[in-house]
Amino acid sequence: MSCVHNNTSFPVQTEAYLKEVFEKYKELQESKDTSLTARFARALKYYQFLIYTAFSDPKFGIGQGENTRGLLIYHQMGMGKTILSLSLAISLSHIYNPILIAPKSLHSNFQQSLLKLIKLLYPETTDHSKELQKISRRFRFVSLDAYNMGQQIIKAGGSLNGCLLIVDEAHNLFRGIINSANDKTNARQLYNNIMQAKNIRILFLTGTPCSKDPFEMVPCFNMLSGRILLPLHYERFYTAYVNKTTNSPLNADKLLNRLVGMISYAGNQNELNKLFPTELPLIIEKVEMSPEQYRQYLLARDVENAEKHASSGMYEKINAAALCLPGSEQESGSSYYVRSRMISIFASEMLTVKEDEKLSEAVQQLPKEAFTENSSPKIVCMLKNIKTSPGPVLIYSQFVELGLHVVARFLEIEGYQCLQPLKVLEEGHNTILLHKDGKDLMVKNFAEDGPTHTLVLSSKITRFTLITGKILSKERDMIQQLWNSPLNIHGEVIKILLVSKTGAEGLDLKYGRQVHILEPYWDKAREDQVKARIIRIGSHDALPPEEKTVQPFLYIAVANQKMFYSIPEGSQEQKTIDERFHERGLEKSHLNSAFRDLLKRAAIECAFNGESGCLMCQPTNALLFHENFERDLRLPNPCQPLVKAEVKAYSISYEGKQFFYQKNKDVGLGYTFYEYNPIIKAYIEIKPSNPLYIKLIKHVQAGTTA
């Protein structure tokens, strides 16, 4: 069976196909079949196996030929997108050259996931190293954040022709494309290369599409379709598909028609939700700035306002270029209110940065007296909350020097010890075992051709550590292994982990009980991504039921009330930058969430999973959309809702085939006929325009009914 996605029959054909695949999955789960397909059925979750089969099956055709070139794998964070993509890469590597594009910090994640997958595929084998090396040689890695990404792609495969392209954290690519002011950026060059590539298959992995703006959908689905499926200009996209008055999607039915067949979604199913820990309601701590902090904050706001006024009007008459968000031309010069946002976290009169001195060094040289509630009410509030946590704690800040490093100094002053992996153990075999020995913890690291290194960690000391974008991958891996050790269930080895945006990407953490987000961001998906580092499938399985919860906190700096009311009326800013970012994020989140709901409705598994609002059309074999989006908006919607019902009908045999019919006065010629569709395993109506319709009428009227 070959399905073409621009066809009203595609949704029902896909639903029927996935039902067959699911039955096959259940059979293979219990079988002793040693074929590769059977091994994958036993290694993968059912929702992964559905996509694995649909994408790799040459007869069905997802991501092939007229069925577009790939899929947006929109699976809830922590559900195994990496394992799914590696499964497809292994199965298709004899046809396509797998190229994996991801931030450099995540490359080791793929290697770890590959080893995990190999162990699942070949549980009867004890030594998986040879198979790992054999399969690893087929893959080529490219760093999404590298300055020479284009050169890396050429080195990896010469071009993207004939490649299976896997892009992890794909939302970063989409945002990079629409934030580009020209075609010289890495993201824009990759977009152009993908659009020009021949015989390419694509997997975009993300748990948060449309995180910044619905316009992110444009580069995503243009690349997946291999043509200009959605309008390139921001204004035209918004005119066609966004109702600015209601802050909601416009012409949603027409947009759904264009997207069907390019999305896989998994995340709402009740049986899957049971595998996650419970996320408790967000606690928002509105923390009043100290007088000195608020004074410095107001000075920073004066500078930012002056910069804003100096540049105002420079871009007002410039319409956004193709694939550009409005204002992307000047975004690189914007401060994003960095000064005031950092001061909202920490402000000290003692902090001075000398010439040629790094900010982080200046923070380290500050005396203990600089780290008080007066300099950072936010951090002091956070530390009080952390002391209530019965298990490991994750802290996130976008800011490293005046965010995470300041928190680290506060923790050291409170008696916490910083654990730095490379100072703990020399590099070894990447295998870490932890053993309890009385009141101490012994960490052992086995070198391949050398001695075993051991460090005794006192269980009386509470430790923290940091993962930022500057940390080496081997350090990052070691920290993750220590955190996920069975002996760290309640934070005995690492109680607190501090992460930045780059550092948090791809982390797969267990046992976490609290998440602290030190400052709000206008992109609420960022907060979801941070929480998803510890809210994952199976992450809390080792804990008793009452401990399978995660409490998130968000800290918002508000004005010092006494000083605020002393400012002349009319000169005050009614809301702090923290408050404005939070409110803007909620407003933008409403629109982005509505578009993400559309993606779920267009997902190929939607009807199979029994979700509501799925795109399901009467299978008339008509085109779902016109290639010209403006003309498409003017045409009637060819997708007529599919209604399944039992009806009383008479049987008729004609030319060796069975049909059913009803006498219906409301129909022009007085009859409604039905024929069996083996693809969807149901009877569908024969339209009066079908030549068979007249023949059946004559057959009935001739009195030859069965």
From Swiss-Prot:
State the compartments where it is located.
Virion
Keyword Secreted in annotation:
no
Which Gene Ontology CC terms are recorded?
virion component
Q: Pfam families from the xrefs?
A: Helicase_C, SNF2-rel_dom
Residue interval(s) of motif DEAH box: 168-171
The record lists ATP as bound by 75-82
Keywords from the UniProt entry? ATP-binding, Helicase, Hydrolase, Late protein, Nucleotide-binding, Transcription, Transcription regulation, Transcription termination, Virion
Say which domain of life the source belongs to.
Answer: Viruses
Give GO BP annotations, semicolon-separated: DNA repair; DNA-templated transcription termination; replication fork processing
Q: Which Gene3D superfamilies match?
A: P-loop containing nucleotide triphosphate hydrolases, Tandem AAA-ATPase domain
Q: Which residues form the Helicase ATP-binding domain?
A: 62-227
Check the record and name the InterPro entries matching this protein: Helicase_ATP-bd (IPR014001), Helicase_C-like (IPR001650), P-loop_NTPase (IPR027417), SNF2-like_sf (IPR038718), SNF2_N (IPR000330)
> What EC identifiers does the entry list?
3.6.4.-
Chief location category:
virion
Enumerate the GO terms in the molecular function aspect: ATP binding; hydrolase activity; RNA helicase activity
The Helicase C-terminal domain is annotated at 417-599
Asked if the keyword Transcription regulation belongs to this entry, the reply reads yes
Induction context:
Expressed in the late phase of the viral replicative cycle.
Q: Which purpose does this protein serve, as stated in its record?
A: Putative DNA-dependent ATPase required for providing the needed energy to achieve the termination of early transcripts.
User: Can you tell me which family this protein belongs to?
Assistant: Belongs to the DEAD box helicase family. DEAH subfamily.
Provide the assembly information.
Part of the viral DNA-directed RNA polymerase that consists of 8 polII-like subunits (RPB1, RPB2, RPB3, RPB5, RPB6, RPB7, RPB9, RPB10), a capping enzyme and a termination factor.
Any idea what this protein is called? Termination factor NPH-I homolog
